[in-house]
């Protein structure tokens, strides 16, 4: 299968502050990261699948820009014990990233003389290695309940564990749309998330329209709302 996605975040206007004007200079800057991804996955056997995603990343903060190419890769294996399966994945793997652009070096001290700065330090992308396990304690033609456990090992943060659950209910055999509710919690970061969605198959076609909503409680950023519209085939 082949997939394509476009991601964009609009953070709105951010006040510009300096050492001497901590409440704002009257200027604002915009922050807007976006990504374009192309993925390919293949089922090699009834139990084993693998895939890879190539991503072009663009970020801009005021006059600073950042461009880079990253990729994700993962494998998926069904154990043969009920519906249990596990997966291994690495995300945001790539070379060092370097910002470009020009900023004015303003402030006090010998290193803040108002000169323009156009050379910046390179840094590693936020690589994350994950191992996950999932199964369905309840599954039949009208409903399913999924539970999952995942180990997260990022290169820029402490290792943590994620717990997740999803319950899906089919409306009827005549109208096989699904209503879905989800919940999750990250142990170690004390972050929770929840969401809901509806997936509607198109009659006479092998397409499924998907509409999903999720809420994540990120301590440093507050609540984050995500709305997703998609089509699976």
Protein language model regions, located:
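Subset of outer-membrane beta-barrel
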Residues: 1-233
